[in-house]
């Protein structure tokens, strides 16, 4: 299974927390970008069968209909009729009957909406331009065409209360859609919040919010299938599962990453260089050891974890022999169920600490 990620960096406004490659929308710049994107795809795509496509950003829905028509002409090379899952990211206020109908007719079958919060103060803090009323109105338009809809929610804002989080989840459940991605706010250095030296909330408060989200969503029959992702059965994100299963994927566009034929690569974040055709800035040939490490780091994000037999068949190595597994099994920081090595759900919140112990045998032995 191979996926394709396409990055559209244009936005109508810049959110205070965003650390992705983005630029304000300018029509003449979009035209140049589409030319460069087409050149990159033609030059690097090797005509393999593609199972999933994800168009993200930035804000893909900031493109006008002429831009979108050009984009979809470019990506027809991926044989859109054969794509199993095709996700397109949208901002709430960009959702119109015209846009949604266009996406539906052009084989998109999954929509991801940047909601972030239903609370007015939180939306203002994040520099989001929509309201709670907008969210409900626009999701109703989407539901005329799509059943597979995700929203993103950001929690643990410095101005946010525990009750705000409860309210956000309550409102999400009212939408009656099958997927939600919940992210604790990370204050990145070069964002608006980072420049203002905003301090994050305490780990205790963060965990309390996270624990509530997990408990409430599971109570409402959502499957907690990855650290930050919850879905009704059958609505898990196949594109993202391919990432977490250490599958191969193309990354096209400004700042995109890819992993093809044992090579991980990164595209430039410099728009001027990208428009001139200097796409890749880094290519890394992955050793077997690095590949196994990636398999563990990505696979343990999933609540199902890593199948031990599949790991052996893929690498001809026992995972217990390669990594510091046994002490963590004794500490119950890892468990084995149905031949899957995984982090227990009540420990997934400290996944990064567990991964550190897995890859640092000496320190783990001292503890």
Predicted regions, residues:
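C-terminal scaffold of the Radical SAM
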Residues: 1, 22-44, 51-315
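Immediate flanking context of iron-sulfur cluster ligation sites
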Residues: 1-8
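Local cysteine-cluster metal-coordination motifs and their immediate loop/turn environment
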Residues: 9-20
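Intrinsically disordered, low-complexity acidic/Ser/Pro/Gln-rich regions
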Residues: 207, 329-330
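Short amphipathic alpha-helical interaction segments
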Residues: 315-329
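A short, conserved structural fragment
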Residues: 330-339
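Minor-groove-contacting beta-hairpin "wing" of winged helix-turn-helix DNA-binding domains
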Residues: 340-344
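Short, amphipathic alpha-helical interaction segments positioned at domain boundaries
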Residues: 346-367
């Amino acid at each position: 299974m191979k996926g394709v990620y396409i990055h559209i960096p244009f936005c109508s406004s810049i959110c205070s927390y965003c650390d992705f490659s983005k630029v304000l929308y300018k029509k003449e710049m979009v035209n140049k970008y589409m030319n460069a994107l087409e050149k990159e795809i033609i030059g690097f795509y090797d005509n393999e069968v593609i199972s999933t496509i994800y168009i993200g950003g930035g804000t893909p829905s900031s493109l006008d209909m002429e831009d979108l028509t050009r984009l979809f002409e470019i990506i027809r090379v991926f044989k859109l009729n054969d794509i199993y899952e095709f996700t397109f990211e949208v901002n709430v206020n960009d959702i119109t009957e015209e846009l949604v109908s266009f996406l539906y007719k052009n084989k998109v079958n999954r929509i991801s909406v940047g909601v972030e919060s239903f609370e007015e103060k939180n939306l203002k803090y994040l520099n989001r331009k929509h309201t709670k009323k907008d969210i409900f109105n626009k999701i109703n338009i989407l539901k005329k065409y799509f059943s597979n809809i995700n929203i993103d929610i950001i929690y643990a804002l410095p101005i946010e209360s525990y009750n705000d989080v409860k309210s956000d989840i309550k409102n999400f459940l009212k939408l009656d859609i099958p997927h939600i991605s919940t992210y604790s706010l990370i204050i990145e250095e070069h964002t608006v919040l980072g420049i203002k030296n905003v301090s994050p909330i305490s780990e205790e408060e963060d965990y309390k919010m996270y624990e509530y989200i997990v408990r409430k969503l599971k109570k409402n029959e959502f499957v907690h299938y990855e650290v930050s992702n919850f879905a009704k059965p059958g609505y898990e994100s196949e594109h993202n599962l391919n990432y977490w299963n250490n599958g191969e994927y193309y990354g096209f566009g400004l700042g995109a990453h890819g992993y093809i034929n044992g090579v991980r690569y990164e595209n430039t974040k410099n728009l001027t260089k990208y428009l001139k055709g200097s796409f890749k800035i880094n290519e890394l040939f992955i050793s077997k050891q690095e590949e196994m490490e990636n398999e563990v780091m990505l696979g343990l994000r999933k609540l199902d974890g890593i199948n031990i037999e599949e790991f052996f068949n893929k690498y001809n190595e026992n995972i217990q022999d390669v990594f510091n597994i046994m002490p963590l099994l004794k500490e119950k920081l890892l468990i084995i169920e149905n031949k899957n090595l995984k982090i227990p759900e009540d420990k997934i919140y400290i996944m990064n600490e567990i991964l550190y112990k897995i890859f640092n045998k000496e320190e783990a032995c001292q503890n």
